[in-house]
């Protein structure tokens, strides 16, 4: 699972392999997997011409690193996971063009795009899901917190193409 630096996807089990934390007390009793962790090309505010140019360069570099991770791990990359807004330790926002680049990479390589909406879903951004502010659509959404339960939503059209998929 390709994921990003400065991400927060949880503090238990496999989610720790996707979360950046430097406090060993939080992960010492859990397995940690060496999955590809990619540069985080979030926007830097204020959005000046200089900051935007830096963001675009970082997006291109992140997409290149993802391509390299896919090529060096053939048939081993199942998904890319990202929070539409990284909300741990500040707000990190992404450009629509970056999410579209992720969507294209996933489509070209037959891997899933997962949006972790645990902190951003259920109307907190003004839309039901934060990804609805962008053009790229995920294959899977994870959600929780505000719903009092956690869950996973999957793209019906995509998964109906797969006989006996786990979402039937």
Where are these regions (language model features)?
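Conserved N-terminal phosphate-binding loop of PLP-dependent enzymes in the Aspartate aminotransferase
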Residues: 2-168
């Amino acid at each position: 699972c390709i994921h990003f630096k400065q991400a927060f996807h949880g503090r238990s089990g496999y989610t720790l392999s996707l979360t950046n934390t430097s406090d060993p007390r939080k992960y010492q009793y859990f397995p940690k997997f060496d999955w590809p962790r990619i540069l985080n090309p979030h926007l830097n505010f204020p959005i000046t011409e200089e900051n935007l140019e830096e963001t675009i360069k970082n997006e291109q570099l992140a997409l290149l690193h993802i391509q390299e991770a896919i090529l060096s791990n053939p048939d081993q990359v199942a998904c890319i996971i990202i929070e539409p807004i990284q909300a741990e330790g500040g707000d990190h926002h992404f450009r629509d063009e970056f999410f579209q680049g992720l969507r294209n990479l996933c489509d070209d390589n037959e891997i899933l795009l997962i949006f972790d909406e645990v902190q951003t879903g259920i109307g907190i951004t003004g839309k039901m899901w934060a990804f609805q502010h962008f053009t790229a659509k995920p294959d899977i959404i994870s959600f929780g917190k505000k719903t009092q339960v956690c869950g996973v939503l999957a793209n019906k059209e995509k998964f109906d193409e797969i006989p006996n998929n786990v979402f039937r």
